[in-house]
């Protein structure tokens, strides 16, 4: 047994990090390297399902699983701790409760909400980010409904939910809300007509980048289910009372709301920025082999990274799909770095994108085919199950998968 | 058919009011009188189960049923409205959306929390009173737990629950909390040891009036399940930060808590007071036939009334048990008033009192026998089912009853 085995440290047990770890043991033998995975919690959560946990349509426990259940515990050290800093020069990771030395580092810390400096959003708006924020938002909405009937003077702002952003996350969350609000009305004896769901989007269209036919379908479905859209309208400020929004060159409007949700953007994890990597909004533009430029022993993947599409000369949008595929490449390349061989270039294989509209509806493109309604919703669940399958195999898929197809 | 049938109006569909209405049709024929029942909601709720709904151990929908399902709709007019005032001189009831003229009036509006003028309790403490307050308290507690892990600086006051009052309601609520807190800890990833449940009671003992052996049993059980008791200690003030409490002649103590529950007393409904009846804390000391002194056409029952125990020369404590028994007497006496006959005197038949300590434990006295543990818990459920049976018969009991005996 080698005494000085190289140390591989993987930060984050998200889609990218966990995929790396589960594949790594194929390419790196027990005598080749020590493997350590660091994650804040002892569980992995499905970031792509957080709109459901946030609305309360899917319990958060259905959206997470124990990390120890999917890693090879005899090969991988799991450290439950919070990464505080990465010291590149000292090859060291500072944790809340200790430090780790590495020879090879994989960064998969994911994203954090981006508020673009809009006043008050950080303080008063709810992000859709992880298990903690999802439980908070779900409970906050429930408390607003629960409070409504206990007050002598009725407050419509308790029943007004503003969603900032009509991109992927915003639309998926609105889809869940449209299903959840009638349930909340029943649970708390509130008339549905008193509840307002307002989506505010600065861009001139909903779901930018999506096929216009699918966009129309989604907007129509959501409007039919009580969502009001304010398109081409920017959130200018968030306060404890609500939001100020406005169209260009028009008088701003105040919307009173106790529940402002910010779903209009994410950026890379600040720790990556603070570590000194060159970055754009916290994302490091990685080399084709997924290493950070100038750092031959550091791989960065998923939402912490930025990968260019050679054809369009624009970066790929950060998705779980890409993060997982990158995990496979990182695992392979770590094997080659340690045991020799040429590093592989990452080649994304975009199978499609489907945005859910509640449990039974969706829009998207899969293998180049436009889908909407039941077929799209079916595919969405197949995709959701696929992440489980790729990381945890059939057992995990059966345990946590979505099988209520129709 | 008589053109000028007398009008009977019953206010409140609680234990007393609903019992009156369901029995009244036995003593008063369709040609004898018009019967109108007024209640704020279209449902009756089990006030005696509100500690469960408030803690979240029993869903509030399990604690209520539709009024129309238990009244004879061909005989009883049901008006869903809020009573705003009673004008005795004009024989008129003012509702939020109208007025009702009566010849005979039955008042069963129940109780409201009594804060004894303690500063801040009205504003910042949670009562355990009805479906609305229960949902609010349940959701408030959940939100505190949900928030805890989302804050960088951990706030113990989110996990500190103070219950003011170790009487019947306080102890029953503590019993539910003891069961609920471990569930909340699991749901929100909070360590049980971080949660504090503190009971503050000004009187020198827990459950005043109960047998000391049963009191010891209850205190021991609750302490074992993590409840801290501060006995002989008064709540002096409630603020948004928590409570100030103190023993006589000692330095007061500040307890930081986001959840202060006030379970230390109720008083009669203010509408009864405002109507001009002579009263003590909103309760009218009624004649033996349950009429208000000086008002031959007005019956008052349940928590709105005060009925003297001739033996002890003290009033009976207000209970659902008595309210229901009074309903039977009121129905009979209304029949006699209208059709002739001497009015009956109300004779309470106290079968016992059982305080639950969560779902599987309780203490109490039934037919003079002391009970604790499983037998007491069994009897508690029998009593809970009995109210359903008396008002709605077997059908309602099977639908809403508590049958998980062990
Ligand atoms: C509501 C929503 C819906 C989405 N839908 C889709 C979709 O349908 N399809 C799709 O492909 N993509 C979707 N995305 C995008 C997708 O979720 C992300 O691109 C993906 O999660 C990125 O994976 P990752 O491995 O980089 O990070 P993540 O999967 O987010 O994981 C990051 C991990 O790092 C951990 N971590 C963070 N900070 C620290 C720290 N300081 N110390 C220790 N551990 C830390 C976290 O706990 C987490 O486990 C969606 C996103 C959202 C929010
Ligand atoms: C947590 C708890 C546990 C208890 N446990 C027990 C127990 O184990 N055994 C026991 O015997 N007693 C118990 N009690 C006491 C018991 O609940 C009361 O004594 C009983 O509810 C009194 O019945 P009531 O008919 O007077 O009023 P309630 O049953 O309280 O009904 C009053 C009704 O009036 C309606 N109302 C109020 N205001 C208006 C308005 N302005 N307009 C129209 N309608 C209105 C309400 O909606 C309600 O339907 C408990 C009380 C609590 C809070």
UniProtKB/Swiss-Prot annotation, chains A, B:
Domain of life: Bacteria
Cofactor binding note: Binds 1 FAD per subunit.
Cofactor needs: FAD
UniProt-listed GO biological process terms: aerobic electron transport chain
Coiled-coil spans in chain: none
EC number of the protein: 1.6.-.-
Root EC class: oxidoreductase
A Pfam family annotated for this UniProt entry: Pyr_redox_2
Keywords: FAD, Flavoprotein, Oxidoreductase
GO MF annotation, one: NAD(P)H dehydrogenase (quinone) activity
Transmembrane segments: none
Similarity comment: Belongs to the NADH dehydrogenase family.
Protein name per Swiss-Prot or TrEMBL: NADH dehydrogenase-like protein YumB
Gene this chain is encoded by: yumB
